[in-house]
């Protein structure tokens, strides 16, 4: 049955995540020997901190989309495989969650000033998460993490095919439809409190077995930008 197949898949993916995390760490250590360093945003030089403060102020903050979710505000649509910063905001009443999109056409890899032959970088979602308090001014942030939702990609092409539209229009319609299908996975950059997790699971209609906590970047496609700079 499909439900049993999905349960087996979720179980196996959970087993593979520690292997992925260990492999990523080993590769990063090897890259550091080649002077290619994914910097920890909490352990930067003063020069790097000043550079990133200015970068955030001029290149990121003006273009942020931040949402506050509580009884008065609806839950936003989370795009398929897009990264968001999620924060628990201090509130005397019900659970208040803040969400910031990290995909508003930002340059994903931020290269830091470095000596010739060295490549130091962070990812834009790490910068947005670091400065999450600036996206929710007036609120105290109690906890924060990065998250990424994967939506179901299983669509019936024949069912969605309109004979009155040409092939390109049909495919465009199907792709847009797929982007809005139900969530099947929630990735997190760290463990979050049950309060926030349960709120997300309720809104996304997911179960705990569909939650995956990973120590690696939630989207690994950024490596191509690093490779391009290294080989240029």
Model feature map: region roles:
Residues 122-194:
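Conserved catalytic alpha/beta cores of large enzymes that bind or transform nucleotide phosphates
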Residues 29-64:
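Charged, compositionally biased non-catalytic regions
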Residues 1-41:
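Extended, charge-enriched "interface" segments that sit outside catalytic cores
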Residues 186-204, 210-224:
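Extended, H/D-rich, highly charged conserved domains that either
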Residues 95-137, 166, 214-216:
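Extended active-site and interfacial segments that coordinate phosphate-rich ligands
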Residues 51-97:
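Extended, Lys/Arg-enriched charged tracts that mediate electrostatic binding to polyanionic substrates
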Residues 1, 38, 49, 58-62, ...:
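Long alpha-helical segments found as membrane-embedded helices
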């Amino acid at each position: 049955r499909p439900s049993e197949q999905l349960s087996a898949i979720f179980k196996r993916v959970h087993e593979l995540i520690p292997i992925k995390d260990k492999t990523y760490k080993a590769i990063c250590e090897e890259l550091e020997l080649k002077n290619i360093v994914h910097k920890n945003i909490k352990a930067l030089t003063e020069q790097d901190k000043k550079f990133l403060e200015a970068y955030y102020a001029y290149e990121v903050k003006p273009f942020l989309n931040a949402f506050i979710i509580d009884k008065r505000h609806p839950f936003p649509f989370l795009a398929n495989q897009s990264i968001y910063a999620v924060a628990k905001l201090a509130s005397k009443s019900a659970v208040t969650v803040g969400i910031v999109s990290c995909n508003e056409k930002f340059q994903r890899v931020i290269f830091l000033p470095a000596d010739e032959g060295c490549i130091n970088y962070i990812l834009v979602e790490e910068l947005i998460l670091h400065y999450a308090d600036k996206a929710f001014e007036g609120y105290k942030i109690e906890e924060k993490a990065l998250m990424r939702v994967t939506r179901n990609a299983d669509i019936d092409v024949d069912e969605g095919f309109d004979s009155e539209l040409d092939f390109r229009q049909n495919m465009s319609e199907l792709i847009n439809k797929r982007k809005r299908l139900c969530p099947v996975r929630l990735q997190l950059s760290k463990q979050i409190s049950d309060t926030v997790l349960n709120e997300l699971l309720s809104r996304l209609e997911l179960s705990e077995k569909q939650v995956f906590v990973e120590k690696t970047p939630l989207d690994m496609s950024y490596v191509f930008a690093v490779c391009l700079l290294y080989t240029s």
